[in-house]
């Protein structure tokens, strides 16, 4: 189930984003970005709708997924 980011409290959204970044160890290219820079980049993607926050009832977990991957 997709969770609309606009319905989340700011602190909750920030915690989800930070948890995702720390869990994924996402590669941001040749230059290393700070946690804050990574958070801002991911928040921007969420607000633009290119990625979405997803709740899995089966696994009882929350994740951030590329919207195009969900449409496949």
UniProtKB/Swiss-Prot annotation:
Source organism of this protein record: Pasteurella multocida (strain Pm70)
Disulfide bridges in this chain: none
NCBIfam families, alphabetized: PRK04966.1
Family recorded in the similarity comment: Belongs to the UPF0270 family.
Protein name, per record: UPF0270 protein PM1156
Gene3D superfamilies: YehU-like
InterPro entries linked to this entry: UPF0270 (IPR010648), YehU-like_sf (IPR036685)
